[in-house]
């Protein structure tokens, strides 16, 4: 994408995606410090939210915590299902940009009425119902998003949870300037027109790879930005039965694929189904590859940015309004004060 080209610059979505580079560079990792003692006191952390406020921020935090291997237990679930859980021994973070997502507010009402004393909010607005019920709330600095599809807020939410993980591990959160440059490059790099044509004409776009939240978030963004059907195939799910109903008019995007499984994927999907397979990766793969820089411990942010770039190109090629989906709403399910 190119903000100096009118076919991109007319969309707030493109502007907000590109703003993430400065947001990353200027992020203050100390913002999570004041929450750490309460989390450690509980000994467990539960991250809830709906849609984009949970998928990448929460799941990436869990992935990183498991990679480190020595942190307290961290879990995530949507707020409605979380009503069925005993969260009394967890510090609970509820993420909602509006601060008035119905499911989050309802969960916090229940927990607060039961005497829960470790409820925390993560929002983009002050003076919200969520903030009024939380013991403490961090308000994002990214500013209001004009496009329906959340982008820069997703990145800042993830950075905030990332800072929680670093604090809990007693590690410094370094390298954000380099990450900013890598994300910027991923957002601006040219994508081969042949790839975009294949994706533009695909009946379904599948995303396959690690359960870090990045790929699942791209699956959601495919619906909002391109209006195309999509599905997230976690891990090696792509090799375990779904090939039975796949079609040659569909495309799979592998994000940083497991090298050990590439030959089997080629056998099952390319040769067996006859479908197109594309990869987004920091290395050359067995498939047509959108090459990105290796982001190290922050690599999932670079993957997400590259995926955004692809989705914008598809949307522009389809000639649709990237900012305003027909049915999707900025606040999916709003809490109404009675």
Regions inferred by a protein language model and the residue ranges of each:
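Glycine-rich phosphate/diphosphate-binding loops and the adjacent beta-loop-alpha structural elements
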Residues: 6-13, 44-50, 200-214, 220, ...
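Glycine-rich phosphate-binding loops that contact phosphosugars or nucleotide phosphates
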Residues: 29, 33, 38-184, 188, ...
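Active-site rim loops that border cofactor/substrate pockets in soluble metabolic enzymes
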Residues: 220-251
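Flexible, glycine/charged-enriched surface loops at secondary-structure junctions
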Residues: 14, 172-176, 232-233, 319-326
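Hydrophobic, well-ordered secondary-structure elements that form the walls
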Residues: 310
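ATP/pyrophosphate-binding catalytic subdomain of soluble kinases
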Residues: 179, 187-231
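A short, charged, Gly/Pro-tolerant segment at domain boundaries
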Residues: 321-338
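N-terminal amphipathic/basic leader segments beginning at the initiator methionine
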Residues: 1-24
């Amino acid at each position: 994408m190119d903000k100096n080209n009118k076919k991109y610059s007319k969309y707030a979505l493109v502007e907000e995606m590109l703003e993430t580079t400065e947001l990353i560079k200027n992020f203050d990792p100390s913002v999570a410090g004041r929450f750490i003692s309460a989390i450690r006191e509980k000994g467990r952390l539960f991250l809830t939210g709906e849609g984009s406020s949970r998928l990448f921020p929460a799941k990436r935090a869990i992935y990183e915590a498991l990679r480190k291997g020595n942190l307290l237990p961290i879990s995530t679930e949507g707020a409605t299902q979380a009503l069925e859980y005993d969260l009394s021994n967890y510090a609970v973070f509820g993420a909602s940009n509006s601060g008035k997502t119905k499911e989050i507010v309802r969960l916090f009402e229940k927990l607060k009425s039961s005497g829960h004393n470790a409820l925390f909010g993560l929002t983009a607005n002050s003076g919200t119902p969520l903030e009024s019920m939380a013991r403490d709330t961090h308000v994002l600095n990214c500013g209001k998003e004009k496009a329906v599809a959340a982008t820069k807020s997703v990145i800042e939410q993830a950075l905030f949870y990332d800072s929680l993980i670093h604090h809990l591990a007693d590690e410094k959160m370094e390298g954000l300037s380099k990450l900013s440059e890598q994300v910027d490059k991923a957002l601006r790099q040219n994508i081969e027109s042949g790839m975009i044509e294949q994706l533009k004409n695909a009946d379904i776009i599948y995303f396959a790879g690690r359960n870090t939240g990045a790929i699942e978030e791209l699956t959601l963004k495919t619906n909002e930005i391109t209006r195309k059907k999509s599905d997230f195939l976690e891990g090696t799910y792509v090799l375990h039965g779904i090939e039975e109903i796949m079609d040659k008019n569909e495309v799979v995007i592998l994000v940083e694929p497991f090298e050990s499984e590439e030959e089997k994927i080629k056998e099952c999907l390319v040769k067996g189904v006859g479908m197109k397979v594309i990869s987004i990766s920091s290395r050359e793969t067995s498939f047509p590859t959108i090459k990105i820089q290796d982001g190290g411990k922050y690599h999932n942010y670079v993957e997400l940015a590259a995926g955004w770039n692809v989705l914008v190109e598809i949307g522009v090629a389809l000639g649709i309004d990237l900012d305003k989906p027909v049915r999707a709403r900025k606040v999916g399910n709003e809490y109404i004060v009675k």
